[in-house]
A protein has these predicted regions:
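Active-site/ligand-binding-proximal alpha/beta "capping" segment
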Residues: 160-214
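Amphipathic alpha-helical repeat scaffolds
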Residues: 92-99, 144, 213-217
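Hydrophobic, well-structured mid-protein blocks that either form specific transmembrane helices
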Residues: 83-131
């Protein structure tokens, strides 16, 4: 059963003010029967929602609802696995989020945690970039990331932060424990408070001239390192 099947799709219908005749009247009747929210708005509002021609009505669909933290723990328990979460600290690029979701699904991570502020949310662009992974990877959106990290630690997780000045090479990570990996923002990395809450700091060795990797590339390397160690090849 896909995670997507467990959530309720949210729909809002915008109707142009003064347009309640003919087919629109039927739309309003059906919306009322199905308890769908209807909002009467100026024509300009509908034109912002619909890029092309319209007939005085538009529907806005939120095809993904955010999960709760308990859902991530439940996903790990259902697989009889140690929790493996991803924390994204103020990631703003929707393509990076979509790409990270693809990798998270590939390695069997149990979910992603993002902040409500200064972070990209679940949008159509993210859905497209994830190429379907958004249907399978639960995402939790939290108000206070530091407090969430504290809660995770109280529930037994060890948190690995990625930092260019990290004290350990990421290849030395011990992943035989419940864990979460923090990926910082594209331009600034992890915030100071988030960094201070991490149990371990690791870095990706760089032998070339550039000093950093794209957030989604760095995430892919770290997530597959966890996968490689948790599911080693049989000799």
């Amino acid at each position: 059963l896909k995670y997507y099947d467990l959530i309720e799709i949210s729909i809002k219908i915008y109707v142009q003010e003064g347009s309640q005749k003919g087919v629109l009247k039927q739309v309003l009747t059906l919306a009322k029967e199905r308890k769908i929210q209807v909002q009467f708005v100026p024509k300009q509002k509908i034109e912002k929602v619909v890029s092309g021609a319209h007939q005085g009505v538009a529907a806005q669909v939120a095809a993904y609802q955010y999960a709760e933290l308990d859902d991530l723990f439940a996903a790990a328990e259902a697989k009889d696995e140690m929790p493996f979460f991803i924390i994204l600290d103020e990631l703003e690029d929707p393509h990076n989020l979509g790409s990270i979701m693809r990798t998270a699904d590939s390695v069997g991570a149990h979910g992603i945690i993002i902040p409500k502020r200064r972070s990209v949310g679940l949008t159509q662009t993210v859905a497209k970039a994830s190429t379907g992974a958004m249907e399978y990877v639960p995402v939790v959106r939290v108000t206070n990331m530091v407090r969430t990290m504290e809660e995770l630690q109280k529930r037994g997780l060890w948190i690995f932060g990625t930092d260019a000045k990290g004290s350990s090479d990421y290849r030395t990570m011990d992943v035989d424990m419940p864990l979460a990996i923090v990926i910082g923002s594209e331009g600034f990395g992890m915030s100071r408070l988030v960094r201070e809450k991490c149990d371990f700091l690791v870095h990706l060795p760089m032998r070339g001239k550039v000093t950093s990797l794209n957030a989604s590339v760095a995430a892919s390397l770290l997530l597959y390192e966890v996968y490689r160690k948790r599911f080693p090849l049989e000799k």
